[in-house]
């Protein structure tokens, strides 16, 4: 961090310290020290596109849009339920690699090319989240990266501090 930015942070801290009793400096130092951890899965698209499966910074985890794949092969092009289960199984593994679990998920975003699959997708989603109940969005979209994909899921997890 440059001296310029540190000076600004320090001056801001002094002003806020007066108002908050010193809590701001602790939080600012904690924020500055947070490291970024990327999870790569070996997909050729990670380098081609410049992304990773998940990123953890501090206690926040963001998981990229995930589609149904088993050993590099697409899963059941006509079965949104099976695709959703596969996606959530893959995401669960990614969370475990980051010392997290599905219980830490606070939000899922489900994208589908066919909103008539809502019940099938919802049933599969409930298999993992019935007792956790993260906030969830279900979005009908025009298409995903391949016509076989019916479902793509992104999620956010937050670990307790």
Model-flagged regions — what are they?
Residues 34-161:
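Short, polar/acidic, helix-capping and beta-turn segments at strand->helix junctions
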Residues 14-33:
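Short, Lys/Arg-enriched N-terminal segments with co-localized hydrophobic residues
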């Amino acid at each position: 961090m440059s001296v310029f930015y540190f000076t600004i942070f320090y001056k801001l801290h002094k002003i806020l310290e007066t108002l908050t009793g010193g809590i701001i400096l602790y939080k600012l130092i904690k924020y500055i020290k947070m490291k970024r951890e990327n999870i790569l899965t070996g997909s050729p698209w990670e380098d081609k596109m410049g992304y990773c499966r998940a990123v953890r910074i501090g206690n926040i985890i963001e998981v990229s849009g995930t589609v149904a794949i088993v050993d590099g092969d697409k899963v059941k092009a006509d079965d949104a339920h099976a695709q959703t289960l596969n996606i959530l199984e893959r995401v669960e593994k990614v969370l475990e690699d980051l010392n997290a679990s599905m219980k830490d998920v606070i939000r899922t975003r489900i994208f589908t090319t066919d909103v008539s699959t809502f019940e099938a997708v919802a049933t599969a989603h409930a298999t993992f989240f019935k007792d956790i109940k993260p906030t969830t969005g279900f979005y009908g979209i025009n298409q995903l990266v391949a016509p076989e994909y019916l479902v793509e899921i992104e999620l956010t997890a937050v670990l307790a501090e």
